[in-house]
Amino acid sequence: YHPSNARFFFYGDDPVAKRFDLLRPYLEGVKPGPASPQVELQASFDAPVTITRPYPAASEKPEDQKHALSVAWLLPVNDDPLLSLATAMLAHILMGTPASPLRKALIESGMGEDVFGTGVDDDLGLMDMLRQLYFNAGLKGIKGENVEAVERLILDTLKDLAEAGIDQETVNASVNTIEFQLRENNFGRLPRGLVIFIRALSTWKYGGDPLQPLHFTEPLSAIKDRLVSEPRFFEGMLAEHLLENPHRVTLHMQPDPAFQSKLEEAEQTRLRETAAKLSSEERQRIFENAREVQRLQETPDSPEDLAKLPMLELDDLEKKVRTIPLEIAEDGEGPIWFHPLPTNGIVYADIGFDLHSLPAQLLPYFAIYGRALLEMGTARRDYVELSQRMGYQTGGIEPAALISGQLGSDESQSWFFLRGKAMVGQSGALFDISREVLLEPRFDQRDRLRQIVMEEKARLESSLLPSGHQLVSGRVQSGFDEAAWVEEQIDGIESLFFLRKLIKRIDEDWPEVLQDLQTIHRLLIARSAALFNLTSAESDWPRIEPHVRGLRQALPEAGGERRRWEPAFERGNQGLSIPAQVNYVGKGTRLASVPASHHGPMNIASSLLNTSWLWERVRLQGGAYGAWCGYDPFSGFVGFVSYRDPQIVGTLKAYDAASDYLRKLELDRSELTKSIIGVIGRLDAYMLPDAKGFASMSRRLTGLTDEVRQQRRDQVLSTRNRDLQELGELFDEVAQQGRVVVMGSQTALKDALAEKGENWLHISPLL
């Protein structure tokens, strides 16, 4: 952490001299430190290598044990802008979409459940951050007898592509997709400046030019020129860097039901052997060190140390909410909402349909309905041709959902969206493709639908460990309000249960599954249930509007009748067992009543619990990787959840004690100011034009007007200690009435059950 090993970034149009003035106090008088260690290059292999490794499996049944296989190649050093960009394009060509040739071959082989690798789901970031580039492709959910066949399929498919050639339309689509991404420079919630810093680091940290990764126009033009003079440019890359490259690793992950117990036993053995060798003095030193660690964990930072951290003051914050311009065209044919914002010549289109048009029992299909629309082809073209057209003529079209509570109602706002973007000059193509997808879908391809369902099931199963806290939190809240209940049906643990059953139904009762999809489409895709939300420059609207109205007019008139759902809320405590060494512990409830004046302080309280009480008790002392408190202002739900947590009962006790912590809270002015600033920072979260347009639409649908937003901002800015102390009583409701959902190992769940007494937790297997 010596300054000699640091890199300093500034983003903005501020004077350079001012930047040096900011740095000077931190660097003056600091002596140079040791030189930064260099990351050495990997020694090249003379021949490919195969490695087999075990991983923990929950089931001992052979039919339930799924293998995974990956084939990876080490590529040249990441110091050639043209090669780096061309490698990203090649990865997208091979794996970037379900219609990409290598990904398609793996999917259609039927030998696995889900594809992974470089380029899948835009997974190109890590590749660019390493000193040497790489490419990998793999399949998971494989039967043991098919492992070698999967490796052969990957190598044979690449060989066939190098020899027979890659479809030129696929190449054009991928080149356009990568170019659109580079020119749009849209990274969602990540500020552009931060992304630019990260890009610069990809070369700078290895001693290269930090500006090199930022200049993409020259290598992009060079690649386009090469494709004209050398049409088989990518086939040549494929042959040179993959097929003829001996630096290849085949990694086979083999399920082992005993692996977890072997790990634990090995650890216990190592501890016993180490303890046996310790002298009494060494034991005493370990004891004293442990006690000192505990003291440090329990000792708050001194005011003097905290004062060293630079911070804003309340006067630095904007007092008024930031508003987003919205123009509404209501002509009796359905709403068209337009957000005039500068978008650099891009139109963002959100075409939405009200899910309340459907009976509740069909909602779980929305785990796969959007993908079925876009990835099964249409009456005019198969899904490969459809994917090529989307890639070549647009910046992408994706399915999305907006699920939210709304002010003044127990009903949710639940919408299905097609979200697309294109250069304004291609807006006609964007809406023509959308019309084709919405009016001419093909749901009758049984094998393709089965592949989509298998992939979604595998995606959810793979997310259990990295995103377990989100799944547990959502399942807790699904017992209390409609919006969370809908989310649980379409993208939660309940959705995983549905997808597992759906695979069997596709095999055994295909006509009924097909009928369900057709019924969903008939009821949902209707003019009366539609909402068009557009974002672009005001001057571009005359070129876009005719295409919007044309698509709206083409939608069927029948369907779209709104239904009221009656959710069957499950509020019992649940334990969900998975093969893991850590737990995810959730607890929460819907508060009986939250006074309107408390919404602002509730945001402060949840933020404060995250950075103080939960940080200290659950993370520092309890050993969890993370813990959070959340508050939903629409439903009044308050919930806690932990991440990668070795505890269960201890964590629940910390949650229950949060109310006393708030009651006794006495923050000094500086600490209270920091908490307020943190909440305002989230209220004023960074948004690019597409996100602004979607956020404005969401606010209008849910009743979160600018007036309501201003009231809550005023509450946040004026929060005092007594406001937070009064919330202790509300948090008592969570302690006394909260629902508990825990995901973790069978052993940990049973231990928690025994510690707290029988029958407080119903345990069932999840994985």
Q: For each predicted feature, which ranges?
A:
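Extended, regular secondary-structure scaffolds
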Residues: 1, 16-34, 164, 244-247, ...
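Generic recognition of flexible, low-complexity loop/linker segments
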Residues: 56-59, 121-127, 221-225, 236-241, ...
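In a subset of proteins, long, contiguous C-terminal domains/tails are tracked
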Residues: 718-767
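Extended alpha-helical coiled-coil "stalk/arm" regions that scaffold and mediate dimerization/assembly
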Residues: 229, 233-240, 280
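M16 family metallopeptidases and their MPP-like homologs
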Residues: 5-11, 65-76, 104-226, 246-256, ...
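His/Glu-based metal-binding/catalytic segments typifying zinc-dependent metallopeptidases
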Residues: 35-105, 136, 191-214, 275-374, ...
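Short amphipathic alpha-helices in soluble, non-transmembrane regions
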Residues: 21-27, 150-155, 432-434, 545-551, ...
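Non-catalytic, conformational "gating/processing" segments within enzyme and secreted inhibitor domains
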Residues: 1-26, 513-548, 736-737
